[in-house]
Amino acid sequence: MAIGQEKESNRSIIQEYTPSILLRKGQWDIKWFNNLYTETRATFGGNESDIARNTFFTSTVDVFTGLSESRSLNVGLLLEFRSNVIGGRDALDVFSFDGESGSARSGLTSFAPAIKFNPIKSIGNFTIQSAFHIPLVDNETEDNVFLDQNGYIFQNRFFYDYSFSDGDWQLFTELNSEYSFKEETSFASNSLRLIPGAFLSYFPSPKFTVLGFVQHLQLISFETEGFEQDATILGTGAKYQLSDELNIELLYSNFVRGNDTGLGQTFNIGLRALF
């Protein structure tokens, strides 16, 4: 059966503290996650074709702490940094941060106060994370280089996990919803982005897990001639608990299909400290 918020166990940190689980008062959860997306194919207007390589690097820091012993509410802050290069530049050029006109941009792009709570007390491993993203970008695109959205975003992420009785398998599900407020100069003005996902993990040992996942991305515009897109993403990865406080994760994913989107792949590494 699934593990509730109030139930103690001898499981490892990576087994017990999924994104569905809230922190107790005085606990801290700090996650540094890095995503490198690179593409050489895209599908727009119903046509799939080769394109010059574009690469988008996103680095986020999420900090949360608990406010009560009953794990009823967590508060946090999300920070996002981006570095993008286009026009056939090498994927690793995102780490040069050279700001070359017409091919590169980088900078801190947004921050977001956030809360995390459990709306149904009888289901302790179902939680919602709400965040209000405040943009630090004036222009989404400069010299043909996109950096990030310049509009406000209200994000809600719905988390649920289920641990199978043998303890070796765990299913984690998420629905990420992002409403982009009306902003005339934003490509996603007055739109809703939905990203459901399912992650199946196998634990050969309590401190190590391998996983596979599937996600779908759907951007729905409420404008008469707004931009819309969709994509299906398949991926795999692993997590390892380095110490009682620190774990590392590696993920790979591939955009296997889509409409009006790039068909690239992502390489991800994250570090999470919980104390």
Question: Where are the predicted features?
Answer:
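Transmembrane beta-barrel domains of Gram-negative outer membranes and organellar outer membranes
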Residues: 3-180, 193-274
